[in-house]
């Protein structure tokens, strides 16, 4: 997938992406991901 920092830049807020556990610990794999800003668009959350 495209990495947004290459052309678009980062936006607040960050979102949490949770993936199913890849092991038998039963723990969700959650990571903070930046929302991607499209060039020329301004979003005021």
Curated annotation (Swiss-Prot):
Cysteine disulfide partners in this protein: 4-36, 11-30, 18-37
Keyword terms: Antimicrobial, Disulfide bond, Ion channel impairing toxin, Myotoxin, Neurotoxin, Potassium channel impairing toxin, Secreted, Toxin, Voltage-gated potassium channel impairing toxin
Keyword Transport tagged: no
GO function terms (MF aspect): potassium channel regulator activity; toxin activity
Tissues showing expression: Expressed by the venom gland.
Any one GO cellular component localisation term in the record: extracellular region
Localization annotation: Secreted
Principal subcellular localization: secreted
Domain of life: Eukaryota
Keyword flag Secreted: yes
SUPFAM superfamilies in the record: Defensin-like
GO aspect biological process, one term: envenomation resulting in occlusion of the pore of voltage-gated potassium channel in another organism
Function: Cationic peptide that possesses multiple functions. It acts as a cell-penetrating peptide (CPP), and as a potent voltage-gated potassium channel (Kv) inhibitor. It exhibits antimicrobial activities, hind limb paralysis, and severe muscle necrosis by a non-enzymatic mechanism.
Assembly behavior: Monomer.
Family of this protein: Belongs to the crotamine-myotoxin family.
UniProt protein name: Myotoxin-2
